[in-house]
């Protein structure tokens, strides 16, 4: 590598500086040597003061960008700036622990009138206050209890991730005293100048004081307005509910009761006035629809007579009598109006649909006789079907599979095939109920019965081939339909 691009980050030779005549052997004068020494010393000092160790991504050669010395976050990796590193490190640490970095703050309110407890965590169904979905937050992370007798807050941590309790510095509580409470790790926050021994570390950072709670830890501290719980990326602010909010529903209930009483009094005064009957039949426009006017006039006159008789003969309170009469009048008028709007229509009687007579099913003997008249060897087909059931890989075969044994059997109907199988002594049947996945009824299944087979050669051959699994178990000879059920979590 040439001298113009050195490997060291410090500049040794500048192409724009005056030449060093000390390196030239033909230099006759000593003044030039002194000038070369002073120039090289000034160049070396200038490079050491203004060119720090660059970052790995910087380019080699002459540094063209300005030195970043005023930024707090840029911490150089060279020991050339020890003073600057010592100044920037406290600022950087305070910035990391500041609560302003958290993006979300959740309020948790406690009832000051009684001992109230809320649970905090990730699961909304198990906790009163649900935090965000975060891997550092457990399903039930902590519980917060307010004790109104002593104005204290009890914080208990359930999670192995722990939490950080943050409060303001002006509260003057800097020590945690150990309290033996049922052999659990319980602490109490005490003032700074207390004689108690401090058992847990408390960090003093600027205007806030922090201490951590691990899994199973409990702390008792006096309630202040600025207590916050840090769950990493989420802050929980603890506060008390306002006492005025509980008195507002009572005030609204009293107001509603007063309004209801005034309304009932007003309605009673209205009902005490005498009844005045007016004839309003002339004001209404009349519709001419067959003989509906006669019905409406008769109903109106009957209503008036009934109302007068009921009012004169009743001994009960006028309020109840008037309400019952009004109800009767209303129902009768609705009936008359409905008869006016809906003229009578003749309904056609429902005609019973003609049911086609179904063909009666033939018996087994009739089916076999019909097959013999068609020159079909029933005994041969029985022998083929029995051999298929006896030497099949499965012990039970449905009917639709037996129809596909050969071409001659496939031409038979299902009833004819059932008749052939039912006539064989060594063939058993399992009747099934229900439907398959396509909604079609399930076919019956047939199996080979070794004990009832008269062909001894076939019995010996089947037992020698299949061994002990020749017969069908009795529990499998009845149909059992299984349904899929979603497994429990």
Curated annotation (Swiss-Prot):
Localization in the cell: Nucleus
Induction: Regulated in a cell cycle-dependent manner, peaking in G1 phase. Appears exclusively during the G1 and S phases (at protein level). Negatively regulated by transcription factor SBF (SWI4-SWI6 cell-cycle box binding factor).
PTM annotation (Phosphoserine): residues: 40, 100
SUPFAM superfamilies reported in the protein's UniProt record: SMAD/FHA domain (SSF49879)
Entry similarity comment: Belongs to the PLM2/TOS4 family.
Other comment: Present with 284 molecules/cell in log phase SD medium.
Protein name in the entry: Protein TOS4
Organism this protein belongs to: Saccharomyces cerevisiae (strain ATCC 204508 / S288c) (Baker's yeast)
Lineage summary: Eukaryota, Fungi, Dikarya, Ascomycota, Saccharomycotina
Gene, per the UniProt record: TOS4
